[in-house]
C-alpha cells in the first residue's frame, strides 16, 4: 500500500465500498456531505445504488428497506439529520436490520454551528430512540480510523444483525492525513447476509413487539423475551480499546479528543509525570471492564470531551478512583491548557 494524502470523509467512502456497501441513501448536510458526494460518484462504478432522498427520515427508512431486501446499506448525516433518524434507528434495532449510520458531529443543539466540531451527540447515539435497545457506536480518531472502523462497522452490523453508528466529528471528517490504505475496490471478505433475512418464504417484519416469527404480540412475557434476546446478542461483543503510555494519569478519550489526550500525555511525560491513554474506539456497548481495569492503576482519570460531559458519566459509573471531566465547546483546547488542568488536580 502506498502513502496518500486523503480526507477523513473520503476514507470513510473507501472503507464503505471496500466493505461491500452497495446501497446509500442520504441527504447532504455539513460536515458529512463529502461522504454523500463520494458515494454518488463512486458507488455506481461498483454496481451500487446511490439515492439522494428528500430528508433524513426518508434516508434511514430507505436504508432499512434496502437492508431487508439483502443490500449492504449505509447512510450519513450530522446532528439535525441524526435527530430525525432516531425513530428509524429504533426500528432498525427491533427488526435487527444490519445498517450503518455515519454521524459526523457538529456544534448544536438545533442548527448550531454547521462548520464547528462537537462531540455532543455521544449520548444521543446510545439512547436517542425511545425504549430499551442495544446499539453499537464506534468512534474514529484519525483518517486511518475512518477507513478501518467503517469496514468494521459493516462486519459488526452483519455479525450481530444490528444497526451500527460510526460517530465521527468535523475535525476527523475534514482533516487530511498521509496514510497507507487498501486501494478502492479491494473488497473485504465476510458474511454479508443478515441471519433473519427473508429466504424464499413469507416473513413478517414489524416495529411492534413481536414473537420469534415476527408476529405482533402484547404478551408481556414475549416482550421481556424479545428484549433479553436483543441484549444477549452482544454478550460476545468485544469492545475495541487501545492503551498506550504508562501508568499514572489516565486519559480516557475518544474521537478527536483522543488526539488532544495523546499530545497532553506527551507533554506530561516531558515534565516527569507518567501518563497513559485509553483510546475508546467503540463507545457502546460501553467498555466497562477495560475502563475499570486500567483505572485501578491510575492516580487520576481524566476524560476530555468536546461537550458538557457525557461519556465521563459512564467512566465515573465504573471507576473507583478520582475522575476529572474536562469540557470544551466548538474546538479542541490546546494540550498545554489540558496539562495545566491536570497539574491542578495532582
UniProtKB/Swiss-Prot annotation:
Catalyzed chemical reaction(s): 2 oxidized [2Fe-2S]-[ferredoxin] + 2-oxoglutarate + CoA = succinyl-CoA + 2 reduced [2Fe-2S]-[ferredoxin] + CO2 + H(+)
Coiled coil feature spans: none
Pfam families: PFOR_II, POR_N
Source species, domain of life: Archaea
Keywords annotated in UniProt: Oxidoreductase
E.C. no: 1.2.7.3
A GO term for molecular function: 2-oxoglutarate synthase activity
UniProt subunit comment: Heterotetramer of the KorA, KorB, KorC and KorD subunits.
Protein name: 2-oxoglutarate synthase subunit KorA
Organism: Archaeoglobus fulgidus (strain ATCC 49558 / DSM 4304 / JCM 9628 / NBRC 100126 / VC-16)
Gene that produces this protein: korA
